[in-house]
């Protein structure tokens, strides 16, 4: 048996784990949980790590770690209070528990002593008397020792002392007081009322006496004051008092309050009338004026429309009949003579002044209907009134001699004046001939008045077809302006005034106005193109087309990048400066006018116009002799040599001396007769002055361009070499010098490209360095810093990916925890609901069973 036991023991020893024999116990891993990272190539000498992994073990370890940290934070996310153990030495592992307790006790005693015993003076030492504490003796202060005899007197009462040592006087006094109290009996109600009445009467008498004393004192004071006032009758003047006592100045707040208090309140005004209402009122006003004019033209008087009084009957007391005045005069004397003649003269002067006052009253009464302060027809009415007054200022004798003749001639003259007067209402013209017939033969003011009244009588808000009528009127006015421009001499003042009406119509109907302008410009350009195709060249258009281009710049905005009217007008201007040759002085004047229009168009946008610079260069070229200006390059429409290459050269010294600088009139552009030689020379000098002024404006406008000096180079050469001499007038020389200074003052923003004078000598170089081409995908040799940098970048990238992976796993863990909480809550709720239904079912069953028992009974 013993042998068998020994064999079993040996077997157990051999089968025991390695840890029992001193070695560490190694857990047998599940082969299904082992993940082997297979390598594609076996490399000798390489130490492989992580070739075998245990994902289950690492996952369990990570789950346990998250449960201890992340889950704890998640559960305590809504808690704001935390228990902190601040006991001394709690987290110090070097101290033993006994040392911690001793140190804590010492700190507690020290804290207690610092707080409560800081102001006590030796209170820890208890004072004793015969072995007994003094505090206990103070508590038992009623105990009296036999030795303390001095305090016995203080314990006797006053009554006892008076009874024993006062000879009995105290007892007698006490007895007399008792007898006096017995004698005082309570009063009855009647006695109390009488006593109250007596007291009230006594108080009333006292108040009356006080009032009388006060009155006596006030009377006495008044008398004394009157006596003193007589002595103080002499007063100081007010000016001295003002000097002595200055009045305080009112504050800004007081002034503001007074201003607001005394400020006039706003009165309600009439509402603002609409444009349609204003147009209707204007039309009615013009109709009334036209009716008055027709009535005056026919010779009808206002008195004819007034009803005349009928025959007066005997019983008619108020039928328009006025009794005759009593012409008898009172007899009066002055210095002993009668005042008959003076009275007669005064009455005659009054009678002479009465008609004038009546006329003034009539004019003022009718002035409300005929008042037009801003329109020119008011001046015409004043002229007619002046004429009628002059006619009425004839001798009174002639009127007395032939009253019938004077009346007839006055009516005829009034009718003639009204016939010459303009009508107040006009129908819109249906054709250009109608408008021309209305305007021809009239002065400038009358023409403007006719156009204004046509617009007012045919306002679009008055009738349905008035819009189309006014749109036609714009085209008719354009055609009329062209006719005025083609006259010799052109009526430029009327054109200038008509532009205002064209502008108003353009603002009302912009589409029709733009169509009309484009039609006129298109017609002029087609005509010029046809002439170029047939004859090979085309002259500059007439003054009407130039004025149309001028009106275009006034009616429409010229600074837009693209405009349906202004852009074609700019193209038209550029074609005029490039395709029309300069053959005469009229062409020069027209070309300079086109240049002025160009500058007006681009004044705001500051666009560069090469045609403008080329034309000004040609003007300066034809103002210099051919020999002097050789070498300059010109383009069409100018020629370097030819008949008109010296068109603006002035050789007559007398004409140069008599020339005066002035503005160049447009009348020279449409003049049919040829000017004299002196006039022609003056025109040449004026054209040169205008060209220099335009060039100066171009210099100021284009000074900021990078290519400014390249553009102005030929012009500057002509000015410096040929035009700045003494052969021209002083004004032209000053203008030329100012233009040159402006050119030179502009900064050169860029340097032009130039060819190198000689080929540059190359520098001596060393042997070139050969660099091996690096193969992509391999780590090439580099410095230690570069290797360290790459290593850190690789490590940062790896750590970043690992952090993102861990954050993703944390989110998944929290999502699982939240889902488990939700499922637990749902299961708990389901369990409670099920329990509730079970209890209700049990209760229902018991109630039904009880009901069945009752039914059986």
Swiss-Prot record:
BP GO terms, sorted: endonucleolytic cleavage in 5'-ETS of tricistronic rRNA transcript (SSU-rRNA, 5.8S rRNA, LSU-rRNA); endonucleolytic cleavage in ITS1 to separate SSU-rRNA from 5.8S rRNA and LSU-rRNA from tricistronic rRNA transcript (SSU-rRNA, 5.8S rRNA, LSU-rRNA); endonucleolytic cleavage to generate mature 5'-end of SSU-rRNA from (SSU-rRNA, 5.8S rRNA, LSU-rRNA); maturation of SSU-rRNA; maturation of SSU-rRNA from tricistronic rRNA transcript (SSU-rRNA, 5.8S rRNA, LSU-rRNA); ribosomal small subunit biogenesis; rRNA processing
Source superkingdom: Eukaryota
Region (Disordered): 1-34, 162-252, 264-422
A molecular-function term among this protein's GO annotations: enzyme binding
Biased composition (Basic and acidic residues): 176-227, 237-252, 272-300, 322-340, 410-422
Pfam families: Nop14
Keyword RNA-binding applies: no
Location within or outside the cell: Nucleus, Nucleolus
Protein keywords: Nucleus, Phosphoprotein, Ribosome biogenesis, rRNA processing
Biased composition (Acidic residues): 354-375
One GO CC annotation: 90S preribosome
Stated family: Belongs to the NOP14 family.
Subunit structure comment from the entry: Component of the ribosomal small subunit (SSU) processome.
Protein name listed in UniProt: Nucleolar protein 14
Organism encoding this protein: Homo sapiens
């Amino acid at each position: 048996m013993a042998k068998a036991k020994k064999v079993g023991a040996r077997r157990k020893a051999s089968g025991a784990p390695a840890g029992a024999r001193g070695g560490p116990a190694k857990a047998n891993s599940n082969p299904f949980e082992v993940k082997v990272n297979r390598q594609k190539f076996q490399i000798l000498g390489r130490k492989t790590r992580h070739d075998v992994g245990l994902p289950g073990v690492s996952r369990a370890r990570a789950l346990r770690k998250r449960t201890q940290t992340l889950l704890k934070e998640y559960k305590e996310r809504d808690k704001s209070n935390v228990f902190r153990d601040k006991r001394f030495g709690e987290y110090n592992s070097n101290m033993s528990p006994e040392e911690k307790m001793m140190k804590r006790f010492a700190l507690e005693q020290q804290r207690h002593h610092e707080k409560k015993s800081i102001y006590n003076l030796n209170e820890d030492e208890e004072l004793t008397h015969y072995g007994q504490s003094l505090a206990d003796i103070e508590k038992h202060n009623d105990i009296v020792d036999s030795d303390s005899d001095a305090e016995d007197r203080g314990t006797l009462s006053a009554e006892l002392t008076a009874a024993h040592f006062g000879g009995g006087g105290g007892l007698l006094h006490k007895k007399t007081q008792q007898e006096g109290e017995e004698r005082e009996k309570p009063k009855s109600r009647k006695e109390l009322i009488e006593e109250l009445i007596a007291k009230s009467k006594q108080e009333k008498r006292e108040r009356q006496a006080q009032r009388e004393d006060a009155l006596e004192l006030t009377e006495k004071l008044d008398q004394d004051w009157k006596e003193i006032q007589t002595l103080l009758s002499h007063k100081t003047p007010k000016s001295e008092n003002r000097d002595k006592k200055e009045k305080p100045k009112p504050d800004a707040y007081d002034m503001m309050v007074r201003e607001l208090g005394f400020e006039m309140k706003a009165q309600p005004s009439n509402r603002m009338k609409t444009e349609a209402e204003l147009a209707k009122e204007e039309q009615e006003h013009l109709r009334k004026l036209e009716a008055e004019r027709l009535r005056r033209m026919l010779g009808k008087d206002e008195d004819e429309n007034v009803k005349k009084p009928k025959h007066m009957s005997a019983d008619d007391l108020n039928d328009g009949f006025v009794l005759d005045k009593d012409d008898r005069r009172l007899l009066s004397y002055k210095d002993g003579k009668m005042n008959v003649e003076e009275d007669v003269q005064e009455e005659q002067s009054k009678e002479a002044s009465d008609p004038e006052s009546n006329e003034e009253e009539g004019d003022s009464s009718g002035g409300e209907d005929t008042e037009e302060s801003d329109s020119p027809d008011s001046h015409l009415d004043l002229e007619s009134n002046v004429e009628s007054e002059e006619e009425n200022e004839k001798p009174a004798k002639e009127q007395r001699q032939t009253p019938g003749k004077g009346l007839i001639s006055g009516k005829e003259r009034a009718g003639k004046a009204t016939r010459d007067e303009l009508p107040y209402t006009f129908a819109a013209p249906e054709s250009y001939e109608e408008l021309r017939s209305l305007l021809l033969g009239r002065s400038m003011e009358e023409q403007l008045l006719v156009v204004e009244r046509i617009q007012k009588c045919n306002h679009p808000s008055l009738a349905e077809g008035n819009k189309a009528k006014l749109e036609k009127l714009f085209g008719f006015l354009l055609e009329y302006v062209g006719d005025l421009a083609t006259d010799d001499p052109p009526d430029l003042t009327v054109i200038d005034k008509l532009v205002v009406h064209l502008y108003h119509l353009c603002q009302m109907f912009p589409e029709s106005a733009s169509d009309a302008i484009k039609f006129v410009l298109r017609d002029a350009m087609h005509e010029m193109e046809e002439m170029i195709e047939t004859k090979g060249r085309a002259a500059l258009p007439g003054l009407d087309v130039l004025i149309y281009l001028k009106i275009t710049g006034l009616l429409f905005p010229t600074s837009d990048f693209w405009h349906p009217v202004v852009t074609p007008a700019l193209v038209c201007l550029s074609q005029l400066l490039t395709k029309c040759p300069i053959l005469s002085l009229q062409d020069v004047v027209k070309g300079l006018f086109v240049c002025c229009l160009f500058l007006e168009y681009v004044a705001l946008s500051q666009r560069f116009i090469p045609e403008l610079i080329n034309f000004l260069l040609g003007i300066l070229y034809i103002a210099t002799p051919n020999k002097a200006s050789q070498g300059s390059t010109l383009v069409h429409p100018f020629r370097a040599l030819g008949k008109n290459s010296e068109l603006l050269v002035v050789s007559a010294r007398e004409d140069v001396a008599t020339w005066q600088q002035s503005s160049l009139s447009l009348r020279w552009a449409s003049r049919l007769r040829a000017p004299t030689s002196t006039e022609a020379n003056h025109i040449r000098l004026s054209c040169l002055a205008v060209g220099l002024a335009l060039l100066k404006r171009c210099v100021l406008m284009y000074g900021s361009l990078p290519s400014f000096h390249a553009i102005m180079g030929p012009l500057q050469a002509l000015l410096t070499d040929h035009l700045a001499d003494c052969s021209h007038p002083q004004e032209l020389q000053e203008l030329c010098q100012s233009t040159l200074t402006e050119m030179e003052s502009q900064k050169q923003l860029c340097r032009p490209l130039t060819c190198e004078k000689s080929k540059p000598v190359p520098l001596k170089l060393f042997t070139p360095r050969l660099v091996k081409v690096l193969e992509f995908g391999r780590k090439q040799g580099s410095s230690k810093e570069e290797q360290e940098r790459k290593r850190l970048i690789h490590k940062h990238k790896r750590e970043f990916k690992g952090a993102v992976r861990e954050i993703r796993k944390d989110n998944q863990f929290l999502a699982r925890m939240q889902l488990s909480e939700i499922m637990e809550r749902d299961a708990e709720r389901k369990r409670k609901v099920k329990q509730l239904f079970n209890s209700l079912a049990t209760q229902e069953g018991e109630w039904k069973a009880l009901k069945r028992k009752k039914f059986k009974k």
